[in-house]
């Protein structure tokens, strides 16, 4: 009977749809007049229920009677269990073509109704890279696209360090292309992504709007990677159709795979995100404050920034209540100036150099020290991510990581000069924070 049902269903489904959605579709069991179908993942389950439920129901009723029913189940993936079963292994060093932020993982991604579908798609793609290809992920600003995309890259590297993952923004791609053209290294640039990359993740694709030369280069890169069966992830703040001035052939490439949307989160979703962030940072912020934050901000990125600002205050003073939180976040007479923005001015005073010099590429001793110590302080005391530290200091991610590492080494060696500088910064920052909270 199982084979009969599948054969009857196959006759009613086009070849293209069958090969796209039904290759892992099986009859798990038949109980009385109820058929349980099984598929490989929740993504396929959702698609089958949305697009083919009427056809499946018709075949089941024709085979078992008018009162016959069916359901579709999927094999769940348990990342934790799988990692435990593998046990401790000696890992090779990942072969990163471009850096990933190790803080972006599936485990610390807060899942709600607004992003559950996107989360499940990326989780499944991590198990079968290249199976859903390309994946075009879009949403409003600050809803978790970058987190999901990098979580996929980190997961793949964790399970196969030999993979070569390339993560970059479209602006990075464009700048690297122009640099290659200027320096006569175009072939090396093309080989880096077309031949060496196993996974290509392009973030903020909308920044290539109107840049025809970069679009052409990306088109050929896309084709080379896709034809090799390697995974491509495209992230955008809009749908492919809304990418105005993009060449139609590029848009058609984006549409040939999965279009995945992250919806707008509810207040309940934002509250969960706030709780998760404070937990991950190891700082307890009471529910009353988090509830307030989730009522005034409408996306996870703003929630994250608000939580970090309050954590910085709590680390400095040891206490935090709703009144103080409201003052820090919504002072109407004096917009709160983030500590990280003030940090450059503090460094300028302590190291006797201008803010412009700190943000420049100059490497004189006092400027270099100001930059290194400032990056360390921003990351360790103000809880900024290395990516955000890079934005504050106008430096690349790799440069930030290197400078922080150098300061950590000096501290471990007992360098008194560095420790004194950190104390001065700490004192100045506390004075500034006190002024902001009044």
From Swiss-Prot:
It comes from Thermosipho africanus (strain TCF52B). GO terms for molecular function: ATP binding; ATP hydrolysis activity; DNA replication origin binding; lipid binding. Keywords: ATP-binding, Cytoplasm, DNA replication, DNA-binding, Lipid-binding, Nucleotide-binding. Residues 315-438 are annotated as: Domain IV, binds dsDNA. InterPro entries: AAA+_ATPase, Chromosome_initiator_DnaA, Chromosome_initiator_DnaA-like, DnaA_C, DnaA_dom, DnaA_N_dom, DnaA_N_sf, P-loop_NTPase. It is found in: Cytoplasm. GO terms for biological process: DNA replication initiation; regulation of DNA replication. Oligomerizes as a right-handed, spiral filament on DNA at oriC. Residues 1-68 are annotated as: Domain I, interacts with DnaA modulators. This is Chromosomal replication initiator protein DnaA. Plays an essential role in the initiation and regulation of chromosomal replication. ATP-DnaA binds to the origin of replication (oriC) to initiate formation of the DNA replication initiation complex once per cell cycle. Binds the DnaA box (a 9 base pair repeat at the origin) and separates the double-stranded (ds)DNA. Forms a right-handed helical filament on oriC DNA; dsDNA binds to the exterior of the filament while single-stranded (ss)DNA is stabiized in the filament's interior. Its main location: cytoplasm. It comes from the Bacteria.
């Amino acid at each position: 009977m199982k084979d009969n049902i599948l054969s009857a269903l196959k006759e009613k489904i086009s070849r293209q749809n069958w090969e796209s959605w039904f290759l892992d579709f099986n009859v798990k069991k038949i109980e009385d007049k109820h058929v349980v179908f099984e598929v490989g993942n929740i993504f396929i389950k959702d698609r089958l229920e949305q697009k083919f439920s009427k056809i499946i129901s018709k075949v089941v009723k024709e085979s078992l009677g008018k009162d016959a029913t069916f359901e579709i189940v999927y094999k769940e993936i348990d990342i934790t269990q799988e990692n435990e079963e593998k046990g401790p292994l000696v890992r090779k060093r990942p072969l990163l073509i471009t850096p990933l932020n190790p803080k972006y993982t599936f485990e610390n991604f807060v899942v709600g109704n607004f992003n559950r579908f996107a989360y499940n798609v990326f989780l499944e793609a991590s198990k079968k890279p290249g199976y859903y290809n390309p994946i075009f992920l879009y949403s409003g600003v600050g809803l978790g696209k970058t987190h999901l995309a990098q979580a996929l890259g980190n997961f793949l590297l964790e399970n196969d360090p030999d993979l070569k993952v390339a993560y970059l923004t479209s602006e990075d791609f464009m700048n690297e292309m122009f640099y290659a053209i200027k320096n006569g290294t175009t072939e090396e640039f093309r080989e880096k992504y077309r031949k060496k990359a196993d996974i290509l993740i392009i973030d903020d694709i909308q920044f290539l709007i109107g840049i025809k030369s970069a679009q052409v280069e990306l088109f050929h890169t896309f084709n080379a990677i896709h034809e090799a069966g390697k995974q491509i992830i495209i992230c955008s703040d809009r749908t492919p159709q809304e990418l105005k001035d993009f060449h139609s052939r590029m848009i058609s490439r984006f549409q040939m795979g999965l279009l995945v949307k992250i919806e707008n989160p509810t207040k309940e979703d934002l509250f969960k995100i706030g709780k998760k962030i404070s937990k991950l940072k190891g700082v307890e912020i009471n529910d009353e404050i988090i509830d307030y934050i989730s009522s005034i901000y409408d996306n996870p990125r703003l929630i994250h920034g608000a939580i970090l600002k309050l954590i910085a205050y709590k680390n400095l003073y040891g206490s935090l209540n709703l009144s103080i939180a409201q003052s820090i976040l919504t002072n109407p007479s004096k917009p709160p100036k983030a500590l990280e923005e003030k940090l450059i001015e503090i460094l300028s005073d302590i190291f006797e150099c201008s803010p412009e010099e700190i943000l420049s590429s100059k490497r004189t001793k006092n400027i270099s020290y100001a930059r290194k110590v400032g990056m360390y302080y921003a990351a360790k005391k103000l809880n900024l991510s290395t990516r955000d530290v890079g934005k504050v200091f106008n430096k690349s991610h790799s440069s930030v990581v290197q400078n922080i590492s150098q300061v950590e080494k000096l501290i471990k060696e007992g360098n008194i000069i560095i420790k004194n500088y950190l104390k001065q910064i700490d004192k100045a920052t506390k004075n500034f924070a006190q002024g902001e909270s009044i």
